[in-house]
Amino acid sequence: MTVFLGIYRAVYAYEPQTPEELAIQEDDLLYLLQKSDIDDWWTVKKRVIGSDSEEPVGLVPSTYIEEAPVLKKVRAIYDYEQVQNADEELTFHENDVFDVFDDKDADWLLVKSTVSNEFGFIPGNYVEPENGSTSKQEQAAAAAEAPAATPAAAPASAAVLPTNFLPPPQHNDRARMMQSKEDQAPDEDEEGPPPAMPARPTATTETTDATAAAVRSRTRLSYSDNDNDDEEDDYYYNSNSNNVGNHEYNTEYHSWNVTEIEGRKKKKAKLSIGNNKINFIPQKGTPHEWSIDKLVSYDNEKKHMFLEFVDPYRSLELHTGNTTTCEEIMNIIGEYKGASRDPGLREVEMASKSKKRGIVQYDFMAESQDELTIKSGDKVYILDDKKSKDWWMCQLVDSGKSGLVPAQFIEPVRDKKHTESTASGIIKSIKKNFTKSPSRSRSRSRSKSNANASWKDDELQNDVVGSAAGKRSRKSSLSSHKKNSSATKDFPNPKKSRLWVDRSGTFKVDAEFIGCAKGKIHLHKANGVKIAVAADKLSNEDLAYVEKITGFSLEKFKANDGSSSRGTDSRDSERERRRRLKEQEEKERDRRLKERELYELKKARELLDEERSRLQEKELPPIKPPRPTSTTSVPNTTSVPPAESSNNNNSSNKYDWFEFFLNCGVDVSNCQRYTINFDREQLTEDMMPDINNSMLRTLGLREGDIVRVMKHLDKKFGRENIASIPTNATGNMFSQPDGSLNVATSPETSLPQQLLPQTTSPAQTAPSTSAETDDAWTVKPASKSESNLLSKKSEFTGSMQDLLDLQPLEPKKAAASTPEPNLKDLEPVKTGGTTVPAAPVSSAPVSSAPAPLDPFKTGGNNILPLSTGFVMMPMITGGAMLPMQRTGGFVVPQTTFGMQSQVTGGILPVQKTGNGLIPISNTGGAMMPQTTFGAAATVLPLQKTGGGLIPIATTGGAQFPQTSFNVQGQQQLPTGSILPVQKTANGLISANTGVSMPTVQRTGGTMIPQTSFGVSQQLTGGAMMTQPQNTGSAMMPQTSFNAVPQITGGAMMPQTSFNALPQVTGGAMMPLQRTGGALNTFNTGGAMIPQTSFSSQAQNTGGFRPQSQFGLTLQKTGGIAPLNQNQFTGGAMNTLSTGGVLQQQQPQTMNTFNTGGVMQQPQMMTTFNTGGAMQQPQMMNTFNTGGIMQQPQMMNTFNTGGAMQQPQQQALQNQPTGFGFGNGPQQSRQANIFNATASNPFGF
């Protein structure tokens, strides 16, 4: 659908007042783009004919325009569906009727479709006038009865008086209000102001004028938007014709005196343009004439103009004298040039070129995506037949599908009727430009001024000009477009006028040259009078000028002044004659060359047509030409019956190759192609013995067909050179030289097939393919050898094939084996003077002897201990009691999963270590050992000096061990090193003299060993200490994991934080006090209890509230040491005791642990005596970890203030054990009490 809502005509001229408005002139044709609903201003586009011009768009008052009248009706003779500009062109079908509004451009008509009521353009050569075209009266009636655009238009009954002319409506967007349209200045081309415009005619009166108004049109050769009127409209107006002719070129000559510049030379010359020709006449030299299409380029720069012509080639640089003249010449050249190369003409030419049609002769099946499947009898459009002579791009008429088709399958159809109608349409459009105008006589007389011109036509032209007095006539595109108010005479163009002098020199006249005929020179004087002067009366200079203009010799009219002048003139004329002869010869040579090329092309085309017709006469599908992309494709064409083919071939004297190929076993679809190739190469029957593989391959035969043909020829001529070959001989990969399929036999079996055992397998019983079989050479899988076939009947033959035929076994998924523990991590720690090394356990695969079961198992599965990559080392993290170390009992290490175990006032559980139970060190209560993360398991041995116990720390002002993670400088201590003991101040402090360990200094109290995780000096189970200093109050142990503990007052309590910043925000920090080496007591009303947190900020806001956030938070809200709370996390038992300050007077707390069975008897009793005589302890710790009743092993007694009691038992080794923390299998050693020593109490 187009964008045009209607076609309107300007009734009055309008000058725009704002930039968005459009200037229009009377009778301008307008396309309506948009109607306004709020005011009377409509958006229109003005019709301008020309290739380089842009049609302006703007607002106009709706009262100044009306619907354009219909000139005539036309009917479509062809379908037009492929529009190039859908916004302006209409699609239509044959026999559609249109109302024509404008036909000034004969190639594109502005119409309205009576079918769809759409407005737009249609190609002029696609339509023809409808029978019984509209008469002048009907046109006048249609023009008068056309509805007015707005109610402001004049009524149909009466003519609008000039005094009733309405001003245009006010624009809403106008900045200032206009007083009245009547006050606007009239256009200089108009007769008067808008109110003085005559009323529109009615149907009953002034029929002729209405017809004139309806038919009047304007030529639009100017490419300037301001060229809105044409002075020659009325001059070329023909009231007796229904069709207004559109003259393409202005036949009036324009000439200017210019100066030609050649380097530094300047030559005077004259430039004339008219009748579609450009004449350049130098003052001295040969004049040149070119048609407007020979002008290749034209340009100007101020006063200079540059023209370039071809045929003959000439480049001119002209100086016009002033800028106005240069611009005038450029505009006139632009008019002629634009009219000659109007793109509308090219569009019509492309549209008029109908698509080349063709009829499919044979069926063709597409074998690739770019090919098109066609059937015999289909009609196709041949889109491209030049890119390839063998493959044409075609489009099916019915479905519209396009693709490549073999050219020989298509028969082009030459639509003579369509071609003739197209050509006739173009010829008619050309004839309209020149035959429908009364100016044809003047155009013809001027275009043939160099031939036998008729002065009667010139007089007729003068009469026409006289009759057209008072009408507008266009002189040039840059003239002022002014009308001659007193146009009683037609005056000559002053720029073309020159001074004419008679031969005597007496008379001189300023006139314009019109023409020359019958010995007379016709001149147009400056006063408007036209005269005819005898040629023999004019001077020789004037005659020479006429010769230059017309190109004819006037020697017989010139005066014979002397022999020299005659000789000069004769030489010039001879030179001119030779030049013209030379040009004529060049043109003739070019013409002959073009004709020869056309003849050769025509001859080649005829040869192709003959070849195609010869192939079609055979009534056989032609050969499909090979394509580069498909080397093995076979054209699937409809097969021709063999009988018909043979009968046709038998009619000639040629050998029937088709039957030959059929006898050879070639497929029928390929027989025809091979037959045509053999016929083209003129192969006869007597050439059969000479046919070989290379010849057949050259002729396009396939490899399989080559073998078939050669076998047939060998059989026919009895050639035995490739007779039977032994069975063990090899041919090519799939066949033997005799043509039979290759049957591979094993080297050891060379027996004939008759001697081989016969089986009933289909593969073995299949007979060998004979030479006569048609499908012998089709692609088949390679045949199995006899040996392989026979071997499949038996299970195994002992050959390599048995191994190849075996299927791979599916591996069974083995159960996840228990990882071997790292034995280095399980190396025991000694507390005596002798180190008993652990027996090495092989990490090889498990032996036949099963590993002993774990007697302390707490679950239902017998799961051996696993090593998870690290060994958990014991550490102490809190408790308000000073750590006291016991060196005479069993040390029971404990490992935890995911939870940090703390004991602050209870008894540690006992776990299996080897074959016995070893209680862990007890320092002020049962200490739960803690594991280390990311640190090597380095267990330092307890030290024995003189067989007695070594007090590691005194009980006053002790500093608790610190444990830190990710501290640089990791240096692990070797296990089993003996640390000497030093006594400083109040207690003995062990030191390591075997490795570089920092010494520990104490300045205010006794230091307790520190445990560091990842620190270069680590001590997790012995008496070795890192380098903390105690300079004031007692320091509680700190354990930090990438965190900075803060304390705001008093003694620092142990803190354990993982990526958190513990803060103490309340409660008084009570300093530790040392009272004579006895146990320091703490005030429980505000003393801070150690906090252990993972990734959280633990705060103590008052009172006595220990927290453990290793997956569990324990709180105590008051009182003294509650009962212990037991936690089970991850399969290991974690015991946390968060009791307060340990009482020294007969504690009554008993901690009992049962994790796997019934309640067991207590195994250990730990007694503390921190001052005075030994009191009866009331605290009993009972452990049961496996359901087996354990006997009490020992009683640990500490006396730190009174008499030292003798230990009841030698100190045993500290074994790191636990469920899942890298503990290896149980050792197979046995205890022997007879071999027991101080360092080996069980006698392993």
From Swiss-Prot:
Belongs to the SLA1 family. InterPro entries: PH_SLA1, SAM/pointed_sf, SH3-like_dom_sf, SH3_domain, SHD1, Sla1_SH3_1, Sla1_SH3_3. This is Actin cytoskeleton-regulatory complex protein SLA1. GO terms for biological process: actin cortical patch assembly; endocytosis; regulation of actin filament polymerization. Residues 130-248, 415-497, 558-592, 610-649, 726-791, 813-853 are annotated as: Disordered. SMART domains: SH3. It comes from the Eukaryota. Residues 171-184, 568-592, 610-621 have a biased composition (Basic and acidic residues). Residues 226-235 have a biased composition (Acidic residues). Component of the PAN1 actin cytoskeleton-regulatory complex. Interacts with ABP1, KRE6, LAS17, LSB5, RSP5, RVS167, VPS1 and YSC84. There is a cross-link at K471, K548 (Glycyl lysine isopeptide (Lys-Gly) (interchain with G-Cter in ubiquitin)). Sequence repeats lie at residues 868-874, 877-883, 887-893, 923-929, 945-951, 1003-1009, 1020-1026, 1031-1037, 1048-1054, 1065-1071, 1084-1090, 1129-1135, 1155-1161, 1170-1176, 1185-1191, 1200-1206. Residues 726-756 have a biased composition (Polar residues). Phosphorylated by PRK1. It comes from Saccharomyces cerevisiae (strain YJM789) (Baker's yeast). The modification Phosphothreonine is found at T831, T858, T887, T904, T984, T993, T1075. One of its GO terms (molecular function) is actin binding. Keywords: Actin-binding, Cell membrane, Cytoplasm, Cytoskeleton, Endocytosis, Endosome, Isopeptide bond, Membrane, Phosphoprotein, Repeat, SH3 domain, Ubl conjugation. SUPFAM superfamilies: SH3-domain.
